[in-house]
Amino acid sequence: MELDLLSAIIILVATYIVSLLINQWRKSKSQQNLPPSPPKLPVIGHLHFLWGGLPQHVFRSIAQKYGPVAHVQLGEVYSVVLSSAEAAKQAMKVLDPNFADRFDGIGSRTMWYDKDDIIFSPYNDHWRQMRRICVTELLSPKNVRSFGYIRQEEIERLIRLLGSSGGAPVDVTEEVSKMSCVVVCRAAFGSVLKDQGSLAELVKESLALASGFELADLYPSSWLLNLLSLNKYRLQRMRRRLDHILDGFLEEHREKKSGEFGGEDIVDVLFRMQKGSDIKIPITSNCIKGFIFDTFSAGAETSSTTISWALSELMRNPAKMAKVQAEVREALKGKTVVDLSEVQELKYLRSVLKETLRLHPPFPLIPRQSREECEVNGYTIPAKTRIFINVWAIGRDPQYWEDPDTFRPERFDEVSRDFMGNDFEFIPFGAGRRICPGLHFGLANVEIPLAQLLYHFDWKLPQGMTDADLDMTETPGLSGPKKKNVCLVPTLYKSP
């Protein structure tokens, strides 16, 4: 019996050792296929690379040395950065279902209602249902056109405001941002919120804090960092303010009979869909509030940011400014109402917009997460890997773009590339299943105001400033706004 017991122990120990060796061999084999990465430090990994630099800039530098599929260790979090059109295509088309998830973060979890929205929602039945409602009921091209008179009225108000400046500099970024917020408010709620300024400020702060680079997000196992996170408490205070604004409005909205245009606004549609028989996943109040916050984030904040970047680039390139103004003024001459379809026919204006989006995409880094282990460009991507698709770097890659850092709208006359998710060298709105569902709404909120601003005003820099003085610095955060607002002197254009 003693011999049998000894044999059993030996067999168990041998089995354990063999199992360890096999697992180590498998791990070693798997690691041989992992993406390359720079040398990392204990505990922090590659976080020191991000000190003092914007993530999209740092990640491009890493890609230039280690390739378009590179591993970065962000604290405890294993991450991979994709920095080429080919790698982006693998993640957003070939393997799209596997990369359709979003990773978790304090910012998105707190301000977007436990990710019960569309932008940050996991890839699940709730997301599929909400996206279908968004595309077919809320922000379809037909509905976007129906909001046209709202845009026109608010643009006219903006033009009157700018025209009364009397030759003084105007904070164009601030005024365009206010206009964009009013357009979204009226389209979503059928009226202007009395607290819309506070809501717009909450959107800006939330986008700055939702990038996924908060220390508590990078060390998820550390209860101490989570406890001591000042941004977590800041976000919780912001969430309470947001609830106060939206809860009060939704309660009032339930009692009114119709939207301002005699039919349904976006919130009316969501209320109706709540009661629909074909709704499989309940649409909660948090879901509605999350969608409203999505609409402000992607429909107002990014639209005003894109217009600011476009005007800044045109001010630095007077010949381009003259060319696009000549096109707009010839096409819109004598018209009091500007239709979206007319603006979309202005080829050089569309090229200016594309070039602006190439250099300054609304979301420089598109966040994803792998659902299962897979392979991209020959490298193994483990399950639950945090993915960053560096849209900013792809848009400035000399492999796809000649003189990539130069603002040259004419390049889109030479090469046909669009931003609808089919040309992976140019994906400012993403691609695949998670391409921006409000793309048409956002574009309309950029193209028409930009055309009107270029038509009605000649623009000058404030006295003493030159083109070289324009600050083109980006700020950190999920979106990529300018560090400094655009302040210009508008002069009303008088048609000959």
UniProtKB/Swiss-Prot annotation:
Catalytic activity: (4S)-limonene + reduced [NADPH--hemoprotein reductase] + O2 = (1S,5R)-carveol + oxidized [NADPH--hemoprotein reductase] + H2O + H(+)
Record keyword Iron present: yes
Cofactors, names only: heme
Molecular-function GO terms, alphabetical: (S)-limonene 6-monooxygenase activity; heme binding; iron ion binding
CDD domains xref list: CYP71-like
EC number: 1.14.14.51
Subcellular location field: Endoplasmic reticulum membrane
Membrane topology reported for the UniProt record: Single-pass type II membrane protein
Membrane spanning stretches: 2-22
Effect after changing L359M: No effect on regiospecificity
Keywords of the record: Endoplasmic reticulum, Heme, Iron, Membrane, Metal-binding, Monooxygenase, Oxidoreductase, Signal-anchor, Transmembrane, Transmembrane helix
A GO-annotated cellular component: endoplasmic reticulum membrane
Binding, heme: C436
Broad class of where this protein is predominantly found: endoplasmic reticulum
Enzyme class of the recorded protein, top EC level: oxidoreductase
Domain of life: Eukaryota
Gene3D superfamilies, alphabetized: Cytochrome P450
Family the UniProt entry places it in: Belongs to the cytochrome P450 family.
Protein function: Hydroxylates (-)-(4S)-limonene to (-)-trans-carveol, a precursor of (-)-carvone, responsible for the typical spearmint flavor note. Fluorinated substrate analogs are hydroxylated with the same regio- and stereochemistry.
Name of the protein: Cytochrome P450 71D18
